Each structure stands twice: as structure tokens, then as C-alpha cells.
């Protein structure tokens, strides 16, 4: 069974195509004319004028090293960022969820590597920019919270997925037609004309076919064991510790537990709470949501 799972992950890895470009001027020109929407010590994400998302990463030290690939596939951790981010996005695509950005391909141009993600459209902007353009209503804020929590809960149940860095710039907001959306066991809920899309998986980890996929160089001392490394409550607390998400909402007492934790930048687990999409529904605020005609 282990060998079968290994083959499944290896097949995923082969789908991570690296396209080499000899002329780098055009790639850099696109990025220069785009907008930097997020950055860190390992790279930066740009939104191009036509809506495409591109992440420019620092040169991975061993992108083509067979030993590194083997360790990654065996569940011993990946050393390079691009390989893992491509794998994470490829795995999450199996959820067929509109709330996770899709992976396209990796470009290599000289010493630099670029992850091309799907075209979300020029009107899709980071949450931090979105809240500067308008005052969110209770119902809009609640719709954003529910979509985030539902998507994370689904990904964690299926793949033990943890994003690891859910700050406002890693959450894109797209204006869409207002309609009722189907959310599994929760039924149909009004989306308030907003779609949430999660991006940037530089700190992410998950399990695919039982094999843990994670990076070895991202402060391994944060986690004492796999239970902590794949504790999904870290993401939930990261969201509910952000006043921009929960302003004026009294959704669950669990939120206050998160807010009083004094979380670090990457929300290191474990946390003694388990906030789910059901907790949000119990607020009864969704009972008041109707589509105005």
C-alpha cells in the first residue's frame, strides 16, 4: 500500500512541469508592470494587469536534486519552495473548490523561478485592499468568514491541510453575481456577491495518500510532532485573531479564545479549540440573509 501511495505522489510530482525560458526580459517586464500583493523572505506574489497571479521565488537550492525529490515523496520533507507549492496546489485541485487558487506551471528564467497561478481577473483583489474600498456589512463579513472556514475545514478533513499564513493579503476577494451557493450539508447560503480565494502556499503542509508533504527548512522547531504540524486550528485562529475579519461580529465564544492566545506571525499550533463552519451557522446571522430583488 505504501508503494501505491508513493506512486500516486510521484505522479503528482511529474505533473509539476518546469518550463525554461531563455529570454527573461518579457517575464520581468510583466512583473514590473504588475502589482506586488504580497512578499516575504522566500519570494513575492504579483498580480499582473490582465489578472494572472505570479509568484517569483528565490532560487531553490536543490530544485533538480533527485535526493531532495525522493525525500519529499517519502514524506521526509521538501527543501525547495516551488516543488512543494506546486504539489500543494495540485493536490487541492482535487477538491474542485472555487476557494483555492489553481496551479498552472513553473517557469525557470535564468536563476529565477516563477509559479504561474490561474487568472482570477483584474477585479479580484486582496482582502486588505477590498476593505479599503468599502465598509463591509455584517452579512458580507459573515459570508467571507464562512467561505474561509468551510474551505479550510473541507481541505483539512480530506488532506490534513494547513495553510500556515492566512493573512489578509493571502486571501483574495472577487465580486461575483449574488446567488445562493451549495455548501454540502449546510445547504444553500447567500454568497453576498463575494467569492473568497486562498493563495500563497509557502508555509502550507498536507498529507496526500498518507504521505506528509511539508518543507524542512521552515523553522522545524515550531512543531514537536505531526499532530502539531497538521493541526488545522492554527488557520482558524489566525483568521479569528484578525479584527478585520471579526469586527462587530459575535459568532462564537471560541473566537475570544483565539483572540486571547497572543498568536505568533504564523499561528503555531496547537490550540485548544476547534471552530467549524457549523459554529458560524449557529450564530443565526444566516437566518437573516435574503437576496433583495
Please identify what each model-predicted range represents.
Residues 133-164, 168-169:
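Conserved kinase catalytic-core helix
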Residues 187-279:
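C-lobe/activation-segment region of protein kinase-like
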Residues 78, 99-139:
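Conserved structural core of kinase catalytic domains
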Residues 42-94:
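ATP-binding glycine-rich loop module of kinase domains
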Residues 1-18:
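Intrinsically disordered, low-complexity regulatory segments that flank or precede the catalytic domain
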Residues 156-174, 179-188:
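Catalytic-loop of the protein kinase fold
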Residues 59-60, 122, 174, 178, ...:
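Activation segment
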Residues 18-51:
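ATP-binding glycine-rich phosphate-binding loop
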